[in-house]
Amino acid sequence: MSTSERGKRDTATHPVDEVLPPARLTVLGLQHLFIMYAGAIAVPFVVGGALKLSAATIALLVNADLLVAGIATLIQAVGVGKLFGVRLPVVAGATFTVIPPMITIAAKFGGEKGLPYVYGAMLCSGVFGLLIAKPFAKVIRFFPPLVAGIVITVIGLSLIGPAAAMIAGHDTEDPHYGQVSHIMVAFAVVFGILLLARTLRGFLGQIAPLLAIIAGSVLALFTHSWSGGARTGSWDLSGVGHADWLGFAAPFHFGAPRFDAAAIISLCIVMLVTYTESTADMIAVAEMTGKELSSADITRGLAADGLSALLGGSMNSFPDTLFAENVGLVQMTGVRSRWVTAVTGGLLVVMGVVPKVGAFVAAVPEFVVGGAALVMFATVTAVGIQTLKKTEFHGNHNLLIVATSLGLSLLPAYASDRFGNSVFFEKFPDWAQIVFGSPITIAVVAAFTLNLVFNHLGGGVGSPALPVVPAVPAVPAIAVVSARPAPGSGAASAPALQRSPAASPLP
């Protein structure tokens, strides 16, 4: 190999860092936005409804939520020096883990009057998160393909239920639950993605989910569904007319932050759970994109989560985590450029300060997006299974580790009430419900612990523990992208990456 060829190979831009043409960046960024929007605004709606806040106050929370999510996404995708941002194609949004403690804290101090205590605790949890980001990131040393595969698989499986709720409805006792028209449109979106994946090439193949959502939205116009609003019924653009052009609330809108020890402890536990989920998502994206992930990368990504809690506490919002919905989209489309999700972050910021834009996106029927979400969540599961294939299952206890971890982690997902909320640990203390109510957290704890016990302590043999995620080419789980991606698509095969010197197995 000539010196010039070797130089070109060494200086080649990794697909994660590739800057695509502006038009493609915009469309691909919009696709990520459509996928995550329903989840992004769910937290303020649920919290606002539980606390019986006024419509105007809930709208303020939604705007603040989108603004902070946009800032957090920009920080994660673009990065801020050596301090913040994992620099991967990820999207941040409000974590669902914060809902129970946030409602409990606010209700304890008088509903809306208790929000200053919520935001005071959130500020403290953000500081706590920044302090523990570096030591927490060291756990990546104990995430071999065995553990990573289990966690990624659980991420996907635990999201199938929410996808079903998006399609059929969120209350099984509602007379409108499971409408045939909604389910058929969602299936049409799934079929559309498969059809477009089979027939389209290049850029059009990469935006197959977005094209299917658009087609499904048009189809929804002709369904005879009940007029129940954009989130559960068919198209309803009335919210666009009522939305303001500008809607930016001043920091500490609900008053100066106040501090309560129990509230602070609760949200610090939420931060630990958030870090667990974000770490799993970062590992999954690194696996999909072929980008080597070091503990320093994880530290910056977690620090960005901690910073989002500080921003949320001061700007009337919520702590953010990385959205698994968008992790699945990265794998499904094969587009690995982090600048795509940077555009998504910019769009979220715009929606946070221009409510009319957000209201229009919110008008897309939820069952339409649910069809696309179903494929993407299942894709995450497929990536986890693909990762587990790298594990040796003969002459060790790895199969038992996988079986036990999957069984334990899915218990909360399969034991739920009429609204889909897990009730398996409802008799446990509040802190235990927060920690163990997340299948992802249980998966991480179980797989991590069992791997150490069976494969490392006492001379166990099995799966080697690696300090970084192995850099492998990202092969789409479903053929949305052609085997010959279009130039500048960001879907080129990842170059071979050298493992860092620190990447040695545990003794």
What are these regions (language model features)?
Residues 6-10, 40-44, 48, 188-199, ...:
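Juxtamembrane interface elements at the cytosolic ends of transmembrane helices
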Residues 23-40, 178-190, 208, 248-281, ...:
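Hydrophobic, membrane-embedded alpha-helices of multi-pass small-molecule transporters
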Residues 2-89, 100-109:
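N-terminal signal-anchor module of multipass membrane proteins
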Residues 439-507:
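Terminal cytosolic tails of multi-pass membrane transporters
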Residues 10-11, 15-19, 195, 210-267, ...:
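Hydrophobic transmembrane alpha-helices of multi-pass solute/ion transporters
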Residues 22, 48-87, 266-338, 483:
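Membrane-embedded helical hairpins/re-entrant loop segments and their flanking transmembrane helices
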Residues 107-226, 344-345, 349-463:
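Membrane-embedded alpha-helical modules
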